[in-house]
Amino acid sequence: MRLDFWSKIRDVPVEDLIFLDEAGVNLAKVRLYARALRGQRARGTRPQKRGKNVSMIGALALKGVVASINILGATDGLTFEAFVIQKLVPNLWKGATVVWDNSTIHKGQEIEQALREAGVQLIYLPPYSPDFNPIENFWSKVKNTLRSLGARTYQALDLAITKAFSQVSFKDIRNWFAHSCYCILPI
C-alpha cells in the first residue's frame, strides 16, 4: 500500500501538496524536561484538571499553513466537513493535491465532491504511515511550544496556539517535507 501511495504522488509537484490532520491539546500541557542546580530537584506545577480537549485541524503546504481552526471538544465528521468546505476549499488552487489519513471522519461524499468541484485531487495516506505526513512534525513543534507557554485558560490557550503557529518557520516546513521524502530543490 505504501508503494501504491508513492506511485500516485510521485508526479505531483511538491508545491501543490497540502497535508491535513487533526491534533488535540488541553490545559495541562507542561514542559517535560527541566534544569536545576546540581543536587537539587527541578520543580514545577501541573494542573490537576486538564479541562476539555481542544481539537486543532490544520492544512499545511510548502508555503505555510493554508487553513486552520480550533474547536473545543472532539472533531466529528460534520465538524470536519464544515472545516473543509468553509475554510479549506476557499484557500485551495487548481491543481492542488490534498493528502490526509484514512480516518473515518475524512470520508464523506460532500467532502470529496467539494474538493472535486474546486479542481483538487484527494489522496489518502496508506495505513500506519505518519512518516509520510509532514504535518505530524508541525503538530509536534506546536505542542512543544504550547508546553513552554503553559496556557491555563481556554482564551490563553487560543492565543498560545496562534503564537505557536507563528513560531513555525518556512525553513521548518521545508525540512519537514524533505524529512517525509518529498524532494525539494535547494533555494
Specify the residue positions occupied by each region the protein language model found:
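C-terminal anion-handling pockets and recognition modules
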Residues: V14-L17, I135-I187
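Mobile genetic element proteins and their domesticated derivatives, centered on retroelements
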Residues: F19-D21, G58, V84, D101, ...
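Short catalytic/ligand-binding loop motif for oxyanion handling, primarily in non-cytosolic enzymes
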Residues: N26-A28, H106-G108, D131-P134, L185
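RNase H-like two-metal-ion nuclease catalytic core shared by retroviral integrases
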Residues: W100-N102, Q109, I123-R147, Q155
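Extended, low-complexity cationic-aromatic segments
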Residues: M1-I85, C181-Y182
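The start of beta-strands in P-loop NTPase/AAA+ ATPase cores
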Residues: D16, A96-T97, Q121
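Short, basic/hydrophobic alpha-helical segments
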Residues: T79-T97
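A short alpha/beta connector and helix-capping loop motif
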Residues: K29-T45, E110-P126, T145
